[in-house]
């Protein structure tokens, strides 16, 4: 936790105050005021539908998790995960702050379930990439809308990404099978596509949501099997269900907004 705080503090002092809200006098900058201004900006100008969706999903997860007696860690992972993906869809850079907490909690839960691909994905990839995302998205946030500018890929780039992902899934699946992991090829699929989707997220392209749909569907199956085996991870299972529905909605929104911005 100390390391997390150090990294967050470093990012804040270097990018939030200097890049987003540069003070008039750098020698007299007020860290508290800058942080307040940042979060005020991130949590303003929300659409009515998105706000209802975010709080409704959070309430359902919290209520059912408490009913089923899920662990506190599982509930924290689920709630921070939901806030992360919804805020990602809204184009708010603060999504990565929630993502940092989520990946640490989720990695611990995945280790207990022997989903080693998920553990490595979250600790070795998602965790550092959340800090990268904070930096990149802040640089490309539209000051008028408070959201990142959205784009979409050419057909050629879509084909290259699809073929490369298939090859990587097969290779990594073989590796996980030899490690003795549960559902190695499903685990591999979610890991490889998650890596690819996260890169597309950093580049702010609409196609990321297609990959997230596939990842979420496969992961729902994976955690459904885990829950059916008697494990108390209902919060995590519900989290992935919300992820899937969110990806469908956000793909429609991003595709519409990125229609004339091809890369």
What is each PLM-predicted segment?
Residues 125-193:
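Membrane-proximal helix-loop-helix units in multi-pass membrane proteins
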């Amino acid at each position: 936790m100390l390391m997390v705080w150090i990294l967050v503090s470093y990012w804040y002092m270097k990018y939030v105050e200097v890049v987003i809200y540069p003070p008039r006098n750098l020698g007299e900058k007020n860290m508290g005021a800058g942080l307040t201004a940042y979060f005020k900006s991130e949590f303003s100008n929300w659409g009515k539908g998105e706000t209802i969706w975010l709080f409704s999903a959070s309430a359902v997860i919290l209520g059912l998790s408490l009913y089923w007696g899920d662990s506190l860690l599982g509930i924290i992972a689920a709630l921070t995960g939901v806030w992360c993906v919804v805020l990602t869809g809204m184009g708010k850079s603060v999504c990565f702050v929630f993502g940092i907490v989520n990946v640490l909690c989720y990695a611990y839960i995945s280790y207990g379930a022997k989903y080693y691909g998920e553990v490595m994905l979250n600790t070795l990839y998602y965790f550092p990439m959340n800090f990268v995302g904070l930096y990149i998205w802040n640089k490309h946030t539209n000051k008028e809308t408070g959201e990142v500018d959205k784009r979409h890929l050419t057909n050629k780039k879509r084909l290259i990404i699809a073929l490369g992902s298939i090859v990587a899934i097969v290779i990594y699946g073989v590796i996980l099978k030899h490690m003795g992991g549960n559902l190695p090829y499903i685990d591999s699929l979610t890991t490889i596509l998650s890596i690819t989707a996260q890169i597309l997220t950093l580049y702010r392209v609409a196609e990321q949501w297609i990959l997230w749909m596939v990842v979420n569907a496969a992961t729902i199956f994976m955690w459904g099997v885990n829950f059916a085996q008697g494990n108390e991870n209902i919060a995590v299972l519900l989290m992935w269900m919300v992820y899937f529905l969110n990806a469908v909605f956000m793909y429609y929104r991003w595709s519409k907004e990125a229609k004339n911005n091809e890369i």
